[in-house]
Swiss-Prot record:
<feature type="repeat" description="TPR 4">
    <location>
        <begin position="346"/>
        <end position="379"/>
    </location>
</feature>
<dbReference type="Pfam" id="PF13424">
    <property type="entry name" value="TPR_12"/>
</dbReference>
<feature type="compositionally biased region" description="Basic and acidic residues">
    <location>
        <begin position="526"/>
        <end position="544"/>
    </location>
</feature>
<feature type="region of interest" description="Disordered">
    <location>
        <begin position="518"/>
        <end position="571"/>
    </location>
</feature>
<comment type="subunit">
    <text>Oligomeric complex composed of two heavy chains and two light chains.</text>
</comment>
<comment type="similarity">
    <text>Belongs to the kinesin light chain family.</text>
</comment>
<keyword id="KW-0963">Cytoplasm</keyword>
<feature type="repeat" description="TPR 3">
    <location>
        <begin position="304"/>
        <end position="337"/>
    </location>
</feature>
<dbReference type="InterPro" id="IPR015792">
    <property type="entry name" value="Kinesin_light_repeat"/>
</dbReference>
<feature type="compositionally biased region" description="Basic and acidic residues">
    <location>
        <begin position="551"/>
        <end position="562"/>
    </location>
</feature>
<dbReference type="InterPro" id="IPR002151">
    <property type="entry name" value="Kinesin_light"/>
</dbReference>
<feature type="compositionally biased region" description="Basic and acidic residues">
    <location>
        <begin position="167"/>
        <end position="177"/>
    </location>
</feature>
<dbReference type="Pfam" id="PF13374">
    <property type="entry name" value="TPR_10"/>
</dbReference>
<protein>
    <recommendedName>
        <fullName>Kinesin light chain</fullName>
    </recommendedName>
</protein>
<feature type="region of interest" description="Disordered">
    <location>
        <begin position="167"/>
        <end position="210"/>
    </location>
</feature>
<feature type="repeat" description="TPR 6">
    <location>
        <begin position="471"/>
        <end position="504"/>
    </location>
</feature>
<feature type="coiled-coil region">
    <location>
        <begin position="54"/>
        <end position="160"/>
    </location>
</feature>
Length: 571
């Protein structure tokens, strides 16, 4: 009976514990289950010991022929209790196995959740990468389209460059730049302004440059001509010693502070300039300036010419800040001596505007160019080449400031004026090239399926307008059209500029042939006839008045900025 009561008590306790387990955590349930297993295992051992004791008692009673019914009943009860205990142990072990399985399942679930989170993050990252890649692809396609257009433009510029031979440069200089120069600096545009690849100054330019507006003294004329000849041939090893020997002789006979010494210093400065020795040339010009100020006075035109030449030289060395006050002083002298509306004042204003432009002083640049433009239009007329050149310079300044509309207006004015001068008043049947280029741009979509566009025959004849300024304007306006996305209009102007350059070079070749034939013919002329012919050539040269100073700084095909170094126009 004691065993039965013990089993009942254990079962009641077990039921109570199981009831409590429903409110326990998983760890507490596992801990309690382990405790129950230990208790059941102990109880099983106790029951087995009691059962073994009863079985031994039964054997003893049977030997004595006693009554074993009571003992057998107890033994049966104990066997049932042991079976129940074993069942409980099995259930507890199953619960432990289930608990372990649940723990493993929970761990797997947490692992899967972590993988899901990681996959979600990777998915979000991949979406971002896809969006970025699509954006980059779109930008790349846009860049490819832009590069293709730039490639076409560069191919055009390469075609233009093929015709920019040294022969063409020399002849263009003769046509547009052999004027009365103070120092006669040649065009640096074709070599990028690099002193190591400078070409010699033209003889006529050097001749005018040497004197700075003063007549060459008779005693220096022969030496002067020799130096010019050697320097123009690039034979500086002969020209420089000649100049130095002449300087030494002049200083011995006349002293250092003599106008003739200043003239020879100018000649030597020009030779040094052609060699790219800008520092030595500047020192000589400063010396010449001091002599002329002492001997001729601070407000003499020759002083203004030397100041201007020195400013040009500083500009070529990139010393724009040092060049500006020299240029301003030259402007003041020329205004005082020549008057505020003289063309040489306009030249000086152009120089000053360019120096300010290289320093980013665009308000002053616009003011100087506009005043120069007013002077040229008033004194020389709207068809003078200087008007178109100054408009180009002003347009270049507008471009550097991003004022594309104002620049476009000026370029169109230049082309319209050149067209009217060549072909008459503009009307529906006589349109300048820029109008026809814009018509092509507007009609591009209409003929995009391969249908041929109308043949604009009139713009082909406009190619005959072969002024260097007009050709430059065509290229600049074409570059502006490209910036605006008007590629058809840009290609039209570029083709026109290319044809114009080819036409101009053909004229140059024919002129050279004529000059050679004329030279042979002049041998048979009388001195009077030769003098008349030389006078015509000189007048043709003197009609031009600018020297290229540097390329446009922003990389576009803008107007090559001009820095004039001219002496006074005759009033």
């Amino acid at each position: 009976m004691e065993v039965t009561q013990t089993v009942k008590s254990y079962r009641i306790k077990k039921i109570e514990e199981i009831g409590k387990m429903t409110a326990l955590s998983q760890e507490e349930i596992i801990s309690n289950t382990k405790t129950v297993i230990q208790g059941l295992d102990t109880l099983k051992n106790e029951h087995n010991q009691i059962l073994n004791s009863l079985l031994t008692s039964m054997k003893t009673i049977r030997k004595e022929n006693g009554d074993t019914n009571l003992v057998e009943e107890k033994a049966n009860i104990l066997k049932k209790s042991v079976d129940s205990i074993e069942l409980g142990l099995g259930e507890a072990q199953v619960m432990m196995a289930l608990a372990n399985h649940l723990q493993h399942t929970e761990a797997e679930k947490q692992k899967l959740r972590a993988q899901v989170r990681r996959l979600c993050q990777e998915n979000a990252w991949l979406r971002d990468e896809l969006a970025n890649t699509q954006q980059k692809l779109q930008m790349s396609e846009q860049k490819v389209a832009t590069i293709e257009e730039e490639k076409k433009h560069l191919e055009f510029m390469n075609e233009m460059k093929k015709y920019d031979t040294n022969e063409a440069q020399v002849n263009e200089e003769k046509e547009s730049e052999q004027s009365s120069l103070d120092l006669g600096f040649p065009d640096d545009d074709d070599d990028g302004g690099q002193p190591e690849v400078l070409s010699p100054t033209q003889p006529s330019a050097m001749a005018q440059a040497a004197s700075g507006g003063c007549e060459i003294p008779a005693r220096l004329r022969t030496l002067h001509n020799l130096v010019i000849q050697y320097a123009s041939q690039g034979r500086y090893e002969v020209a420089v010693p000649l100049c130095k020997q002449a300087l030494e002789d002049l200083e011995k006979t006349s002293g250092h502070d003599h106008p003739d010494v200043a003239t020879m210093l100018n000649i030597l400065a020009l030779v040094y300039r052609d060699q790219g020795k800008y520092k030595e040339a500047a020192n000589l010009l400063n010396d010449a300036l001091g002599i002329r100020e002492k001997t001729l006075g601070p407000d003499h035109p020759a002083v203004a010419a030397t100041l201007n030449n020195l400013a040009v030289l500083y500009g070529k060395r990139g010393k724009y800040k040092d060049a500006e006050p020299l240029c301003k002083r030259a402007l003041v002298i020329r205004e005082k001596v020549l008057g505020k509306d003289h063309p040489d004042v306009a030249k000086q204003l152009n120089n000053l505007a360019l120096l300010c432009q290289n320093q980013g002083k665009y308000e002053e640049v616009e003011r100087y160019y506009q005043r120069a433009l007013e002077i040229y239009q008033k004194e020389l007329g709207p068809d003078d080449p200087n008007v178109a050149k100054t408009k180009n310079n002003l347009a270049s300044a507008y471009l550097k400031q991003g004022k594309y509309k104002q620049a476009e207006i000026l370029y169109k004015e230049v082309l319209t004026r050149a067209h009217e001068k060549e072909f008459g008043k503009v009307d529906d049947d006589n349109k300048p090239i820029w109008m026809q280029a814009e018509e092509r741009e507007e009609n591009k979509a209409k003929y995009k399926d391969g249908a041929p566009q109308p043949d604009y025959g009139s713009w082909l004849k406009a190619v005959k307008v072969d002024s260097p300024t007009v050709t430059t304007t065509l290229k600049n306006l074409g570059a502006l059209y490209r910036r605006q996305g008007k590629y058809e209009a840009a290609e039209t102007l570029e083709e026109c500029a290319l044809r114009s350059r080819k036409s101009a070079l053909e004229v140059v070749r024919q002129t050279k042939i004529s000059d050679v034939l004329g030279s042979d013919f002049s041998k048979g002329q009388s001195p009077k006839d030769r003098k008349r012919s030389n006078s015509r050539d000189r007048n043709r040269r003197d009609s031009m008045d600018s020297v290229s100073y540097e390329k446009s700084g922003d990389g576009d095909e803008h107007e090559k900025s001009k820095l004039h170094v001219g002496t006074s126009h005759k009033q």
